[in-house]
């Protein structure tokens, strides 16, 4: 499982890096290419995405509602001398402040929130005018039920049973409506289980 997670994370990091570089027309050969980028990682967990973004020079803030995750992430960042700002917080609470971010990473979080509309609205308030939000979620299909719930939770036991509620998974069409109602433009939409839609 550890090796699979590392491969998945390295692919994800490369994808995020490429999208940020293209969006802001950054020279990838610069020593700290993201040094003018403010980045928010929503549901940052242990900081697996925050740390590589910080190493690229971004001014990184990571938020999570689980205090244990923030403590783990903070300790690891301190150990590696990375100036990442971690806090126990929600996007809904953070959106009440005046802070804006050039980049928001929103990876597999929406399927765990109770008010999806408020969540997307809060994210849109936090995103700077010319910013980019990179979003990943589980599509509500039979494939996702089989893989994310039956496979990961029940057969492999990688996550505790009940971690995911299939009814809270979101379809691309539902996501499009939410984004449009919050003046968020979709630049790229990719789904890996298109045969199930």
Regions found by a protein language model. Give the residues of each.
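Acceptor-substrate binding/catalytic loop of class I
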Residues: 137, 157-174
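Conserved SAM-binding loop
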Residues: 27-145, 172
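Short alpha-helix
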Residues: 167-182, 189
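Alpha-helical membrane-targeting segments
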Residues: 8, 141-163, 192
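Conserved hydrophobic residues forming the short capping helix/wall of the S-adenosyl-L-methionine
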Residues: 20, 24, 77, 179
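Conserved alpha-helix/loop element of class I SAM-dependent methyltransferases that forms part
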Residues: 8-35
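Conserved small/polar residues in nucleotide/adenosyl-binding loops
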Residues: 2-9, 190-197
